[in-house]
């Protein structure tokens, strides 16, 4: 328990102390990935993240107003709503989640229809994204240290899972950020609330649960193997 707290404090301090260069690498890699996917980056904008962690530089892409959104994006919205509705009728287990996503899509379309000429500042997206990302990166060691160091039979393996989850969170954030920027560029704010929920908050939770499940599965498997070996030898 003491080791878990020490590791958590050390990693959180390092993430806070090197926040600016970490976000710069994040921005450069995100811009590079966007370029590979032909997503235009029109510039970079300094954004404030938290007191003591500023300024960060966020990549900027052009975001169309709702009146400028093409027919393809509008048809994709309609197909998505119909598809989610059909799936919700068929599968009761995930019906509540799908209904929530449908409500987000309908609300987004209604608000965009009322404010067709509203211009969204892509720099605001970058600022919100980095605020959420830095909060996750600073707090993540506290969760992973308690989860992995307590349940892993070997301390080295627990430390490995902690570092791997931190690195994966960084890489996963780049991919999700570029995906969200692509949605903004091609469809404006039409899909954005739904996408933000899926690749933002829910995405962070899913990745943490994924790592926790894998680590527990491996630790449990090794314990069963050790018990089987001990039973066979005795």
What are these regions (language model features)?
Residues 1-234:
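Hydrophobic N-terminal alpha-helices or hydrophobic patches in metabolic proteins across all domains
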């Amino acid at each position: 328990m003491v080791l878990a707290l020490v590791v958590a404090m050390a990693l959180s301090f390092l993430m806070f102390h090197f926040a600016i260069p970490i976000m710069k690498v994040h921005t450069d890699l995100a811009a590079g990935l966007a370029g590979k996917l032909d997503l235009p980056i029109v510039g970079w904008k300094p954004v404030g993240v938290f007191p003591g962690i500023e300024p960060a530089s966020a990549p900027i892409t052009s975001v169309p107003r709702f009146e400028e959104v093409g027919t393809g994006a509008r048809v994709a919205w309609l197909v998505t709503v119909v598809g989610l509705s059909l799936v919700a009728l068929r599968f009761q287990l995930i019906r509540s989640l799908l209904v929530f996503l449908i409500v987000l899509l309908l609300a987004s379309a209604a608000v965009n229809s009322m404010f067709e000429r509203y211009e969204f500042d892509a720099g605001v997206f970058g600022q919100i994204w980095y605020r959420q990302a830095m909060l996750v990166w600073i707090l993540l060691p506290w969760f992973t240290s308690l989860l992995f160091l307590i349940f892993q039979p070997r301390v080295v393996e627990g430390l490995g899972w902690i570092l791997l989850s931190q690195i994966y969170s960084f890489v996963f954030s780049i991919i999700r950020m570029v995906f969200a920027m692509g949605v903004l560029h091609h469809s404006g704010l039409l899909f954005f609330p739904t996408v933000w929920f899926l690749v933002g908050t829910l995405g962070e939770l899913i990745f943490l649960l994924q790592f926790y499940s894998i680590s527990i599965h491996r630790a449990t498997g090794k314990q069963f193997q050790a018990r089987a070996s001990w039973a066979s030898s005795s």
